[in-house]
Amino acid sequence: MNIIVMKFGGTSVGNISKIKNVAKIVAKEIKKYKIIVVLSAMGGVTNKLQKYIEEIGSNFASENDLILTSGEQVSVGLLSMLLNKMKIKSTTMLGWQVPIITDSCHEKAKILNIDNKNILNSFKTNNVIV
């Protein structure tokens, strides 16, 4: 099984039309590969969330991480929905579902290990993991 990783930043997923374009790009590679898609939050979302955190004045790094990752989760869900609507079997995975093991340094964590068993199992029934 050949697997590729495709990464799209905030500008590439800035609105639904752009997410549809990403889905088309992914669809072109489906015949050759199983695909892992990594997405940023939609353009401007992370900045907006950061402003909310600053307004509250939070010094709680774990909550900051939780809030900031919500932007990526929206993009991931929307793309997976579009791919499935296009009849491309897709599922979503968050870091803890993979799992990706990091150190405990919130906001600046380093990856210690990626256990790929869940990814490989998911590819038995899906063509794309977002």
Task: Label each residue range with its predicted role.
Residues M1-V130:
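Nucleotide/pyrophosphate-binding catalytic subdomain
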